[in-house]
């Protein structure tokens, strides 16, 4: 992200690209290695890169997503040229500005300035069994009393940090990434991570692991 809020990518990423860009990136490493500006978006303050997609947050709290054009899409049935187009999500443009964003293997998550959380994409890590998986949908009952300040996304799981330093998670915990000790466990609704350190300041999710920064007690 540049000082002007412009985003540059390189490697196998055809986000906001057109026509035969995908084929060129696959066959020409010189072209793939060159930084390319993503057209159609500025004023970006945060970008997160997942396995198949990118998500952007602007200073106004707007949220955009696009797919890289490689290895599939987040639960969507679309061809590469359509899916690599930049998409603005209107739910974050009318008094519901986002404060943080993340993308995992094939899902998206965003927290708002009001402390709420929206998820969409592949159903494994959305923390809900209702709503449209292809559109940002509010996590309602299970997180209604919590104020979430940041989010992070792993392969098929999501982590949410509240302002009192509590970590919640949802999705796969087959490798203990949600703090559970039961092999193969999955959670369709958010759970509190009982094994997390106290007074957490920040949390991040990786492929099948997680890390946190805790305040000195």
Where do the language-model regions lie?
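Eukaryote-biased RCC1-like beta-propeller repeat architecture
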Residues: 1-217
